């Protein structure tokens, strides 16, 4: 019996948020699988023509991700521990820049969609969401797979054994039909409470140093370094909260790729939403 997932309904109805597509939980073979229902699509407001000229911030690409310089010792130590653990991380030095919808940056060709900026203006997404903090970030560069009925796996995933262990120990939900090593069908709440702290322990860093990428970090690094992050018809979770108990997600190639920003429940487990860890190393005072 085939499992039903939210993605199929999203593609039938057109783009809408992940959370509002789900009306209940499908009980299938003892598993808690979110399933789509006939939800009303969210209308995203049509852009209005500004009455006055908009000030455009102009940056070079090197003002967002600083050119490679000498890597701090703390960053090098984390990279070495990650390598010993079989985890690949890429270091990027982000600058202290606040972007907006009208910012002009060479290579920033697929900006977050209009809805993202509108929700920041409405206060549903934090005001600091489009800010790149002055810090080194070490990000997992793995490519998401395309959707295959929830059974898809990241190729040669170094986190697979850890995720299988956590499911076996019942620290994260083990759902029937979902591969034990899968990065999918894990809720943001489980990621924050269990998975990311376990990764921090593997890397020998404080739990607070490991988080999900913000939507703007995913977008900027994706544009500049990893366009393939927007070329799979799956999503990934972001660090940003939305409203009271939701979390941003995005990256779906069917809905704009790198520009795509959606949201889902923080407690939701979705067959097409994965994650990537990011380690933050802030400058020493």
Where are these regions (language model features)?
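Short acidic-hydrophobic catalytic motif
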Residues: 1-209, 223-285
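Short acidic catalytic loops
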Residues: 209-220
């Amino acid at each position: 019996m085939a499992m039903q997932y939210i993605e199929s309904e999203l593609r039938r109805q057109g783009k809408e948020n992940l959370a509002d597509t789900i009306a209940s939980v499908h009980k299938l073979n003892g598993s808690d699988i979110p399933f789509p229902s006939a939800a009303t699509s969210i209308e995203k407001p049509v852009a209005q023509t500004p009455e006055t000229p908009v000030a455009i911030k102009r940056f070079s690409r090197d003002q967002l991700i600083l050119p490679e310089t000498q890597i701090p010792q703390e960053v090098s130590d984390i990279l070495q521990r990650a390598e010993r653990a079989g985890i690949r991380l890429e270091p990027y030095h982000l600058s202290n820049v606040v972007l907006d919808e009208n910012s002009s940056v060479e290579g920033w060709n697929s900006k977050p969609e209009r809805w993202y900026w509108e929700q920041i203006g409405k206060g549903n997404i934090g005001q600091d969401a489009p800010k790149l903090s002055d810090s080194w970030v070490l990000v997992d560069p793995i490519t998401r797979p395309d959707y295959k009925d929830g059974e898809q796996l990241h190729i040669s995933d170094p986190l697979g054994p850890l995720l299988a262990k956590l499911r076996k120990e019942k620290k994260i939900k083990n759902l029937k039909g979902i591969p034990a090593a899968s990065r999918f069908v894990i809720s943001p709440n489980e990621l924050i409470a269990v998975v990311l702290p376990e990764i921090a322990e593997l890397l020998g860093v404080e739990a607070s140093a490991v988080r999900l990428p913000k939507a703007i970090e995913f977008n900027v690094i994706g544009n500049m370094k990893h366009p393939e992050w927007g070329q799979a018809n799956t999503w990934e979770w972001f660090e940003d909260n939305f409203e009271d108990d939701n979390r941003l997600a995005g990256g779906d190639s069917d809905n704009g790729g790198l520009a795509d920003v959606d949201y889902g429940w923080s407690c939701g487990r979705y067959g097409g939403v994965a994650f990537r860890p990011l380690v933050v190393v802030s400058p020493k005072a």
